[in-house]
């Protein structure tokens, strides 16, 4: 074998001479062989020596192989790992050298010579005998300078340390940690740190821990001791180098056991840890090092169960169960646990636990533990070598880890914080705002019923389902899940004794928040975080950027359109009433007593000033249990009046606010928290006044709500103040059809109190318990464009309620109404309610009245050729109102304003996509489809009552839906209130046949109604629905140029709001954030190229801006 062909031979020949020989060149092969033969003996010795050295190097490299790979490394693996390390060091060196010559960091660096480094080291090491200073070069890795006392601390010779690489002193398993924390680009300058007041308290870099050994004898067993290292960047000018070279100055401090002198005080033996749901350490506090003996890198990535005593490991299952139970609450304490230290002994820890919940997935992301050492270990030297090897039960640990992981995989539905529980994170402990909760202030309170809230993912899924699959398929899917909850909500018996215990101070204060029967209790509103609100704001902005066409109609004109964008605009008049409500929240409430008595209890009813002020401009919900959604504006006003949280008003700025404060990190952090809080408050006000206000309400998706026409012994719900609890009420029963010949004995006792022999409106009608009738405060003229009629001023309402109330049939005695505009919400298109009645949620709770009859006889009748339009936008269901409105008495003003809607019309928002209906129940089929198509129906059939759950009474058949018509009434029926046969004076009204002993019959009737609902198919109803009512959503394509242009305009408007800093503030900001000089602004050209290959007008405008000038400026200069 040719010795020159062996790659282990030292490279004495140049590549030009050796290369052709390796390629097989015959011309040079002879001379080379002659030279090798002449010097064969000497080269053989050199080859053997080099082989031995190479073997020793390979064996040494195998010691530095990563400890994660449990298999014994081969020679090839060790060489590949060494090659990767060399490439990594070269890349770091080249990167730093390319940054230093022209970067801003070179100008900030201070150059030191060796004498200055010696004085610097002696200055800092004299204060602590366990600390030394070591300076090593980033280019060569060798020590440039080391303190004199380092040899004594490391128990080695001075000359030995000066000739070493600093990495040679480290334990092999800590080399990677050392390199990760000493990257030159992330180190602070030493001269910047020396300007600090304290050396250790205000250190700008996070310290790390490594094990360092001393001694130069390879035969002795190395003993590594833990050290705390603080790295800094310096430039050193040495005689051997013509230019200053970058170096790392490290302050190295030896760590002693916390239980040996000088001992850590008992009350300060505290540290924190963080681990995943799989019980794997994520972070360990540096205070744990002298208490446990483990370095942070020893624990991170390992299981916490490995270090617990085998008998204490099952306790972690109970701990995590309690973590899941107390999510969002303050940290809780559990049983003490025994934790193994590095020397093998156990310490007893008193631990408190809390968790962090991901606000999007609603799952526990990690668990935080705060531990305090109760009992110290037997061997106080926690860094001592472990004598006996710990026995590990891998199977038991794995089984417990899987059990805990499965436990924490379930989402959290409680009103939990989206931050660190109660650990003091910004915005995590805000006051909860309840915009949907309402209850009675009674003496007997029960705990609030919990129900699952709708997460953001469910909202996204529902929106995508509507857009992609279609409205009909969405209704069908919701139908399957609506039957079972309906059956569960109708099991409580009806009671009459609890109707008398309501507090008179809460009668009408929060009347608009009545959302269901007494059993449909709602939990308090979850307080969303800044990130959640920001995401929802983006979703709403995306949805509102669409332009939706009008409904397709055949009745008048197929091309008749109505813009839905005006419906989503906030009403300026409503905003004014909101500001008035905010001012009312800060003054004591003055209540005006209404001299009315309940029919049974005789409890006096009072009117809150805040509630009265909202009655004129905000739609009031009925006391009936049919109302599902609350008008967003009203909900916010009442929530502010009832909860301790109030809308933030602009406070007067005091002189203290203008005190000059330096721009420090604390000031920037406080400013960021303040801006986030202001954004959350503004967004909450915006979202509650928008058509999408239902996203922040905890609405039950499948809770059924029923309405009895005359109250059927119903007890209305009243809002309560925060801190009080709710009283459980008996549920209202399903309404039943009543024949026109029914007498007053068939009505519930509540109604008999409302219908005396004189047939006039009793004062108790205005009370919240009189749920039988409620006139709308803003009526609509039945034309293509709805016109508002008058709403009387607020001060005219209160005095009237008793005395000369208008009779039911007296139409000629009422004064005419004025036609002035009033602050009422915008109306939707004229046929929106018809569509929503058929395909969306609620069917109307009274049939389409014939042309010759009106539900309000004293207001006249509607012509046969006109269609009854809608009531205000918050109640999109169809309510027939007359056009020829006659005079009306002033006494009916309060009845109009206190009962905004008919008690059987739910208050809903008419947003373009009807997104608020995603959380509600299935609609019932429409009873008046053909009646709408034919205008007026001469033939009449009796229709049954339907509730919000979509159930129908037994007399209704599916085949009769398309041909159902309304029974005609004679004009004399309008004045037949004296017969007390029905509340509206009509046999075809939705009246409730509830006798005094009718509880059992209603239960039987309700069960049959629900059983029939499950058998019907929604497609049978859709097939019989006229085409003029059906509508399909068509989402048009958005103009990209328009959207980009609008975004650009908004960005330009935001530029004026950028903070302007003075020169002194810029310098102070640069001192806090030193990187701000070296990192330029991002290039706009790359963003434009990544956006689209086609350049639009907006992109061309952006590209024409002077981008180069912006790139040359640092962030400080741009400020």
UniProtKB/Swiss-Prot annotation:
The PAC domain, residue ranges: 334-377
Domain of life: Eukaryota
UniProt xrefs under InterPro entries: PAS (IPR000014), PAS-like_dom_sf (IPR035965), PAS_fold_3 (IPR013655), Per1-3_PAS-A (IPR048814), Period_circadian-like_C (IPR022728), Period_circadian_regulator (IPR050760)
UniProt motif Nuclear export signal 1: location: 54-63
Position of sequence motif Nuclear export signal 3: 400-409
Region (Disordered): 1-48, 419-449, 483-530, 718-744, 878-910, 947-1011
Listed Polar residues bias regions: 429-442, 491-515, 989-1001
Domain PAS: 120-187, 259-325
Keywords from the UniProt entry: Biological rhythms, Cytoplasm, Nucleus, Phosphoprotein, Repeat, Transcription, Transcription regulation, Ubl conjugation
Extent of Basic and acidic residues compositional bias: 885-903
Main location: cytoplasm
GO cellular component terms given for this protein: cytoplasm; nucleus
Motif (Nuclear localization signal): 720-739
GO biological-process terms attached to the record: circadian regulation of gene expression; circadian rhythm; entrainment of circadian clock by photoperiod; negative regulation of transcription by RNA polymerase II; protein stabilization; regulation of circadian sleep/wake cycle, sleep
Gene Ontology MF terms: kinase binding; transcription cis-regulatory region binding; transcription corepressor binding; ubiquitin protein ligase binding
Sequence motif Nuclear export signal 2, residues: 913-920
Renumbered residue ranges of the record's region CRY binding domain: 1037-1119
Biased composition (Low complexity): 419-428, 970-988
One Pfam family here: Per3-like_PAS-A
Residues covered by region (CSNK1E binding domain): 551-750
Subunit comment: Homodimer. Component of the circadian core oscillator, which includes the CRY proteins, CLOCK or NPAS2, BMAL1 or BMAL2, CSNK1D and/or CSNK1E, TIMELESS and the PER proteins. Interacts directly with PER1, PER2, CRY1, CRY2, and TIMELESS; interaction with CRY1 and CRY2 is weak and not rhythmic. Interacts with FBXW11 and BTRC.
Name of protein: Period circadian protein homolog 3
Organism the protein comes from: Rattus norvegicus
Gene (UniProt): Per3
